[in-house]
From Swiss-Prot:
Its EC number is 1.8.-.-. This is Gamma-interferon-inducible lysosomal thiol reductase. Residues 1-21 form the signal peptide. GO terms for cellular component: extracellular region; lysosome. Residues 22-60 form the Saposin A-type domain. InterPro entries: Interferon-induced_GILT, SAP_A. The keyword Disulfide bond applies. Induction: Strongly up-regulated in spleen and kidney in response to bacterial lipopolysaccharide (LPS). It is found in: Secreted; Lysosome. It is an enzyme of class 1 (oxidoreductase). The keyword Secreted applies. Pfam families: GILT, SapA. Belongs to the GILT family. The lineage of its organism: Eukaryota, Metazoa, Chordata, Craniata, Vertebrata.
Length: 251
């Protein structure tokens, strides 16, 4: 895939003008190394193209609760559909915790969740899924959050996407020390937000939260990601995906 994209880059540069192609032909480096450094790219006449080629993906972090209606709406109608269409230019970070409270009992943590014990269990299941599966957990969590009952959907959703991952292995994390420590890390990450979160869903873009970014993300995350990406826009950005989310769970 990397070689193919560089071949496309070479073709594009040579198509610009005969002069550009002569510049490339005088380059001392093979095409596979053109974008290895800014100096090499400049010497080979492809600096602008390499800057687009090497553009960092937009990172969208969602601080949320598994049973918060507004969180579920944003995740199901905005976040995951946008990721499906723009996965080449976008990363997702999910942090299930939200407006929960944590109590430390000599290194063993207990949690009080805004929507009760079921939400604490949902948060823990999704946290353990993320630990076990990494980004591949996203469709499982989407399946859970789009169901009528998040908790009842968890095991069937896992079975659909990862039949080789046992439910017992997930529950071992949920009920054990591993899940407890993972949720503590979610608490630390949420409580370290600057500015502090006031509600959920709380969205950061490349680690930054502003009222303007939050409003744009909930109005059309798709358009926001396309507008912020510094590289060459994928064809999907010529389309649109809009559905405003204005429901929040206040802290």
């Amino acid at each position: 895939m990397f070689g193919f994209r560089l071949s496309v880059l070479l073709f594009a540069v040579c198509s610009l003008s005969a002069c550009s192609c002569m510049f490339v032909n005088s380059c001392k480096y093979p095409p596979s190394q053109w974008c290895d450094s800014r100096d090499i790219a400049a010497q080979c006449g492809v600096l602008e193209q390499c800057m687009k080629f090497n553009a960092s993906p937009v990172t969208v972090s969602l601080y949320y609760e598994s049973l918060c209606p507004g969180c579920r709406e944003f995740l199901v109608s905005q976040l995951v559909p946008t990721f499906i269409m723009l996965s080449d230019i976008m990363n997702i970070e999910l942090v299930p915790y939200g407006n929960a409270q944590e109590k430390d009992d000599q290194g063993n943590y207990t949690f009080i969740c805004q929507h009760g014990e079921d939400e604490c269990r949902g948060n823990m299941i999704e946290t353990c899924l993320l630990k076990a599966l990494g980004p591949k957990a996203i469709p499982v969590i989407f399946c859970m959050e789009s169901g009528a009952d998040v908790l009842k959907a968890a095991q069937p959703c896992l079975g659909v996407y990862f039949p080789d991952t046992t439910w017992d292995s997930v529950m071992k994390c949920v009920t054990g020390d591993e899940g407890n420590k993972l949720m503590h890390q979610n608490a630390l990450k949420t409580n370290a937000l600057k500015p502090p979160h006031e509600y959920v869903p709380w969205i950061t873009i490349n680690g930054e939260h502003t009222d303007d970014l939050q409003d744009k993300a909930t109005n059309s995350l798709f358009n926001l990601v396309c507008s912020l990406y510094k590289g060459e826009k994928p064809a999907a950005c010529g389309q649109g995906l809009k559905k405003r989310t204005n429901s929040y769970c206040m802290n």
